[in-house]
Structure formats: structure tokens, C-alpha cells
Design a protein with these regions (language model features):
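N-terminal lobe of the biotin/lipoate ligase/transferase fold
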Residues: 2-168, 188-190, 242, 337-341
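Short loop/edge segments at beta-strand edges and connector loops
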Residues: 89, 176-178
């Protein structure tokens, strides 16, 4: 655990009581300079730490502190309770870190949570804005018995799990924009990225890394210009203390039983019901071919998007790895529409 994380844990455990720099340094076995640097870094991340001469430092009561213990304490008895939880301050990307560990033989069920990412990625390698103090970024290592074409099921069950957990926490309706975006009031509040490594001989997945990035609040200074009008937040005001741990645990409590069960029955109909694109016209973008417009009919049993390019033409199922879709009308972002088979 870093000095920064140890200082945060000590201040959180003090429950608002002041701890002197000397007390912190001796308790952690570090220098007072290291403590001061950790305090400065925590303040830069948005933690409200008060300093009083001759008394020391205190973390304001009610601060939303995220650590592995807080997440573990909220895991329900059952399959999810055995998950291995790690929380870090910052990484280039949680997916990249877990993929490296998967290649070294790390076990299924390892969960890596970061409070910020310096090089977060979304689909097609696009940057994923991951600032400190306003989001939650987590990845889960899986070793599923699935073929490559079935990997989209992981994203679908994760989307349903994340939507359930987010709705419980923020109280607002959450929709899913195929294949991997959670939306609140027309704005993206969560992105999901599943990356997999395949065994070429068997055609089955060797492992998959499921990543989820949530916007809990609008970041300090607002959204970057390129995300204005696109990105949104789960909470209009700062969430209650413990919300990040509750969200992480909520996702795991929902996702892990679905994943272990391996059945579509637990999530497919809800994934369809929460879809925002059904009944709307979209622009279909396939690599190397001109874009085409199509009407979305629904989602099939393999979580592919079923579209019709011309009235009366044969419906076509689109896989997430071969296309991107872009709604042609803004109402497709706003509320779930009942879907057809």
C-alpha cells in the first residue's frame, strides 16, 4: 500500500480526530516529509483535509473514502464474497493492468479498482476521461468457457448489473445504449469495455477483462470540450459518503451470480427492456464501407443488434466487434423503449 493510501486510511480511521504529522510518520514508519507529500496529493485528489497548527491533520467526517475493506464489507454472502478486491489511487488503465496480470496467470475473480486513470481507454482505443475525485474505474478478470462470438454476453450482463446498482444508488432511471453505454437523461454515465484473449486451438476464450468506468459527479472544472453535451453524471450533487464503495460492491453483487450461472435468463430480457435504440433509426458504421442508415428492431439472444436497412428487407444482426452505431435522433438516448423479438 502506498504512503498516500496509508495516510488516507489512518485519517479515515481517526473519524475526524486530528493526527499530528509526527504521529502519522511514526505510525507508518515514514518521514514527515513523506506524510506532507501524501497530504498534498490527497488534497489534489479532492479529499477535504483540514490542517491546524499544533494539532495536525483531520479528514472531514462524511468524506467518501474508497478502499478494499469498504468494498468487501458490502459484498453479499455467496459467490461474490470470494472475490479478491484491490483498490489503488491511480493507474494508466485498470484493464491494461489486469490483462498483464492475466498473462502471468492471475486467477479469475481478481477485481482492480482505481480512483483515477491517466490513460483510460474505451472502444476502438478511444480515450476514456478518468479524472480523480469524480468517478469510479474498475476491472474484473474472468476466465469464462465461451467462444469469441459469445464474449458480448459478458458486456450485456455487466450492463444490466451496472444499471441495477446505479439505479439503486442514484434513484434515476438508467438506460442502455447498445452495446456498452449506460445513459441517464440522455447523457453517458458509464462505459463498459470487455477485452479478451483467445486460445487459437480451441477457439475459446483464455481470459477476458471486463472494465467499467462510472461518472459519479461532474469533475472539478467541468467536462472537456469534446465531452460537453455527451458525458453526464449519476449524481447531480456530490453523493453520500460511501457511494463509490457501494457502487463497486453493488455491481459485483449483481454481476458475479449472473456470470457464474451462465444463463441468459437472468439478464437478457432486462437488457432488451433497457435498450434505448430499439425503434429508432441509426447510422451503421462498418470499417471499409460507406455508412448506412437502418431501423433498430431489437436485440437477439446473442446480444447482437438486429436492424433493417430497407422496409421489408431481411433483418440483419450486427455484432459489436464489426460495427459502430450512431443514433440519428437525440430521443434515442433518453428513455427505454419496448422491444420486439
Amino acid at each position: 500500500m502506498s504512503v498516500k493510501a496509508q495516510v488516507l486510511a489512518a485519517l479515515d480511521g481517526a473519524q475526524g480526530r486530528y493526527l499530528s504529522g509526527q504521529e502519522l510518520a511514526e505510525g507508518l514508519g515514514v518521514s514527515r516529509t513523506a506524510v506532507w507529500k501524501a497530504i498534498s496529493a490527497l488534497r489534489a485528489d479532492g479529499y477535504p483535509i483540514d490542517a491546524v497548527t499544533n494539532r495536525g491533520y483531520a479528514l472531514r467526517r462524511g468524506t467518501d473514502v474508497l478502499n478494499a475493506g469498504a468494498v468487501r464489507a458490502l459484498l453479499e454472502p455467496g459467490p461474490a464474497a470470494a472475490l479478491q478486491i484491490e483498490v489503488v489511487d491511480r493507474l494508466p488503465g485498470t484493464n491494461a493492468a489486469l490483462r498483464a496480470r492475466a498473462a502471468q496467470g492471475a486467477p479469475e475473480g481478481l477485481v482492480l479498482i482505481a480512483q483515477a486513470q491517466s490513460a483510460g481507454r474505451g472502444r476502438s482505443g478511444r480515450p476514456f476521461f478518468s479524472p480523480p475525485g469524480s468517478g469510479l474505474y474498475m476491472s474484473i478478470l474472468l476466465r469464462p468457457e465461451l467462444g469469441a462470438r459469445q464474449a458480448v454476453r459478458i458486456t450485456a450482463m455487466a450492463a444490466v448489473s451496472a444499471a441495477r446498482a446505479a439505479e439503486r444508488l442514484c434513484g434515476a432511471e438508467i438506460g442502455i445504449k447498445w452495446v456498452n453505454d449506460l445513459m441517464r437523461d440522455g447523457r453517458k454515465v458509464c462505459g463498459i469495455l470487455t477485452e479478451a484473449s483467445m486460445d487459437l486451438e480451441s477457439g475459446m476464450l483464455d481470459h477476458a477483462v471486463l472494465g467499467l468506468g462510472f461518472n459519479l459527479t461532474e469533475p472539478a472544472g467541468g467536462w472537456p470540450e469534446e465531452l460537453e453535451g455527451i458525458a453526464g453524471a449519476l449524481f447531480e450533487d456530490f453523493p453520500a459518503p460511501g457511494s463509490r464503495a457501494a457502487l463497486a460492491a453493488g455491481v459485483l453483487n449483481e454481476f458475479w451470480p449472473l456470470y457464474r450461472a451462465g444463463s441468459r435468463d437472468g439478464y437478457l430480457e432486462e437488457y432488451r427492456r433497457r435498450q434505448l435504440l430499439t425503434g429508432h433509426t441509426v447510422e451503421v458504421l462498418r470499417p471499409g464501407t460507406p455508412s448506412r442508415t437502418a431501423r433498430v428492431l431489437g436485440v437477439d439472444r446473442d446480444c447482437r443488434l438486429v436492424v433493417q436497412f430497407e422496409p421489408g428487407s431481411t433483418p440483419v444482426a450486427l455484432g459489436s466487434g464489426e460495427v459502430r452505431v450512431r443514433p440519428t435522433d437525440s430521443s434515442a438516448h433518453k428513455s427505454p423503449t419496448a422491444l420486439t423479438e
